[in-house]
Amino acid sequence: LDVKKIICVACKIKPNPACKKICPK
Protein backbone atom coordinates (compact mmCIF):
# COMPACT_ATOMS: atom_id res chain seq x y z
CA LEU A 1 0.00 0.00 0.00
CA ASP A 2 1.67 3.18 -1.19
CA VAL A 3 0.10 5.88 0.95
CA LYS A 4 1.99 8.70 -0.70
CA LYS A 5 0.79 7.61 -4.14
CA ILE A 6 -2.81 7.50 -2.91
CA ILE A 7 -2.47 10.98 -1.43
CA CYS A 8 -0.98 12.23 -4.70
CA VAL A 9 -3.89 10.86 -6.71
CA ALA A 10 -6.39 12.36 -4.29
CA CYS A 11 -4.55 15.67 -4.54
CA LYS A 12 -4.97 15.76 -8.31
CA ILE A 13 -8.72 15.50 -7.74
CA LYS A 14 -8.86 17.89 -4.79
CA PRO A 15 -5.61 19.82 -4.21
CA ASN A 16 -4.58 20.74 -0.68
CA PRO A 17 -1.47 22.16 1.03
CA ALA A 18 -0.40 18.81 2.48
CA CYS A 19 -0.05 17.41 -1.02
CA LYS A 20 2.58 19.96 -1.95
CA LYS A 21 4.78 18.70 0.87
CA ILE A 22 4.36 15.02 0.02
CA CYS A 23 4.05 14.91 -3.77
CA PRO A 24 5.99 16.47 -6.61
CA LYS A 25 4.08 19.12 -8.50
From Swiss-Prot:
Top-level division of the source organism's lineage: Eukaryota
Signal peptide location: none
GO cellular component term, pick one: extracellular region
Keywords carried by this UniProt record: Antibiotic, Antimicrobial, Disulfide bond, Fungicide, Membrane, Secreted, Target cell membrane, Target membrane
Disulfide bridge partners, by residue number: C8-C23, C11-C19
Record bears the keyword tRNA processing: no
Function statement: Antimicrobial peptide active against Gram-positive bacteria M.luteus (MIC=1.6 uM) and B.subtilis (MIC=3.3 uM). Less active against Gram-negative bacteria E.coli (MIC=63.3 uM) and yeast C.albicans (MIC=24.2 uM). Not active against S.aureus and P.aeruginosa. Has no hemolytic activity against human erythrocytes. Probably acts by disrupting membranes of target cells.
Name the UniProt record assigns to this protein: Panurgine K
